Amino acid sequence: MFKKRLISISLVVTLLISAKIMISDHLAKAHTLMVTANYTKESPEGIDDPKWREAQAVQLLVEGREKSTGDNGTVSTWSLYTDDSLYFLFKWKDPTRSITKQSWKYDGKNWHHLQGNEDRIALLFEITRIDKFATRGCAVTCHSPADEPRDNWKLATKTVTEKGDLWHWKAARSAPYNYADDAWLTVAGSPTGSYRETGRRKDAGKGGDLKNQTEDGTQPLYMQDPFKKPSVPEFLLLEEATKITDYSIFKAGDKIPFRLPIKPSGSRFDVKSISRYANGGWMVMLYRKLDTGHEDDVVFNSMKNYGFALAIFDDSGSDHSKTTEPMTLSFARK
């Protein structure tokens, strides 16, 4: 009798443990953030295209350094795909349209940088598997161990076999050319330029921006070419800029952009964008070929799922303010 009771108790405990594991697995799956791309035969032509109504919006909670609450912490996300391309539409509230990016202002005697940076949105996809990315998302690559000083944090993967595809839309630097800067992520190294010792690498091609300053950094070096009409109001494109030869032409209150967008090309120009700021918020459409043919990009297959993460930058030049939990991109069957 005693042995039977022990067997019964052991069986009950085993069943309870099994049930707990099953419930935990179910809850983990139930809380996975899923963004589903709906199939459409024709490409959406812009932000207002009726085709976006074919996709169901997913409300993604974003929070981080400046913890968000309510609608301010939500990014409405839609996704569509065609036979050869993938499309995203993002909408989020932002009380200010930040495109200043430290523009120059003349006070009548000297030039000074204005306060303010730019709004941005970034997506990171796995090209190859990144350890723990599926459960920790951006934190694995963007935030080094929490006990490390912030100055030691590196945007990187831990091994050379782990690679990420980074899409980085910037309101002041990429939006004027209607694209999101396409980069990829690997182990930390020593690349040239502003990326310093991170794992971030530029895709092949041209893009980015040039700092508009003299060698001593005290004043702007370029101005709008007076013989060229600005193709994008409020911005100074490098291809439309000319060197300043006479600073006496400026009067107090004059402003000149500090960051000059460079015309993009090649793989760096794979991710196109359409954007609009209105009614206290941004709407940004990003789209790209499912397969770009470039090794520095993830290849999307509509029969597979893909892990990714998203971050929102509010008037920020470095740390992102808000990020999502890890997410999965799936494709609805045709």
Feature roles, as predicted:
Residues 1-9:
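N-terminal Sec-pathway targeting helices
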Residues 245-275:
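A mid-sequence, solvent-exposed acidic-amphipathic segment
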Residues 85-92, 282-288:
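Short, well-ordered beta-strand segments enriched in hydrophobic/aromatic residues
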Residues 79-80, 91, 302, 309:
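Mature extracytoplasmic or organellar-lumen-exposed domains after removal of signal/transit peptides
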Residues 81-83, 92-94, 290-292, 312-314:
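Beta-strand elements of well-folded, non-transmembrane domains
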